[in-house]
């Protein structure tokens, strides 16, 4: 019977917390800037860890430069993490840009834009039909 939280998942969570603190406080590289550690995926044998990160910038060339800077600093970051976590094997860190946050924001903006356009078209048409809008239906249920 498998445990609810496997050892690799617990290590990944602790590694994520330690990496977030180290990248925010201990790294002084101006090329990296503000970085957020979204997730860490550790291999079963603890030899590798995929570190999913996001940056404040959305420009793809800047993101690639920041990933390259993190990759170059990975051995140093690994030694800092090894000093904080007591593991027999410290995973090799592989930094990967996580575009899910940017994609989520883009999708949210698209949905908002479609809703705005739909409302404008309804006003322009003069609301020829008498069906209540979504907003009116929500007010009726409150």
UniProtKB/Swiss-Prot annotation:
Query: One GO CC annotation, please?
Result: cytosol
Basic and acidic residues bias spans:
118-130
Q: Where in the cell is it found?
A: Cytoplasm
Entry's Gene Ontology molecular function annotations: ribosomal small subunit binding
Methyltransferase as a keyword of this entry, yes or no, is no
Q: Where is the composition biased (Acidic residues)?
A: 131-142
Instruction: State where it is primarily located.
Output: cytoplasm
KW Transcription regulation (keyword) present: no
What role does this protein play?
One of several proteins that assist in the late maturation steps of the functional core of the 30S ribosomal subunit. Associates with free 30S ribosomal subunits (but not with 30S subunits that are part of 70S ribosomes or polysomes). Required for efficient processing of 16S rRNA. May interact with the 5'-terminal helix region of 16S rRNA.
Tell me which HAMAP family the record gives: RbfA (MF_00003)
Annotated protein name in UniProt: Ribosome-binding factor A
Native organism: Shewanella denitrificans (strain OS217 / ATCC BAA-1090 / DSM 15013)
